[in-house]
Amino acid sequence: MKTTAAILEEMRAVCTAVDAEQYQSFVELLKGDGRFFFAGEGRSGLVAKAIAMRLMHSGKTVYVVGETTTPAIAEKDILIVLSGSGKTGQAMSVSENASKTGAKVFLVTTSKEAVQSPVFAGCLVIPAATKYRLPGEPKTIQPLGNQFDQAAHLLLDAAIIDSLEEKDANDEMKKNHTNLE
């Protein structure tokens, strides 16, 4: 249980170090009426899918880039990209393509440099360790990009909750939960 306690402490430190204005900007983005598209590679892509699912439960129209049923993105749509490094090839290519359509592109990353790109209309910088272990990153007992992926999952789930008018939305969200299992 020491490892679990250490990971929980890492999450507390990382999540409380997130810029409050960036976080609130993401919450406001989620309140929008447009369609939401999510993209990410590897474990970050799995987190993106989990967040897309939860946002769908909240009543939003949501798609995951790369799925066969994902339609074309358009001007009033929002693309949320998860990339720990902020430079993952496919995620950045998807961001550029979406930006060209006029869609709003929002990046969730550890990289303060990546957010300088004019492709991104907004960002949420999570000050977590990456697989590169760059100077200035927090220490972690976890391998690779675990710290970023876990913090992204916690923060984005929290942002969905904060975006809801009714904080106790469980019953309403259950209506959108699968009933085929």
Regions found by a protein language model. Give the residues of each.
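Hydrophobic packing residues in well-ordered alpha-helices of helical domains and bundles
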Residues: 4, 23-26, 48
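A short, well-structured juxtamembrane/interface segment
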Residues: 17-32
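Generic N-terminal amphipathic, Lys/Arg-enriched alpha-helix
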Residues: 1-16
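A short, charged, Gly/Pro-tolerant segment at domain boundaries
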Residues: 158, 164-181
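Short, well-ordered alpha-helical segments in soluble proteins
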Residues: 127-130, 163, 167
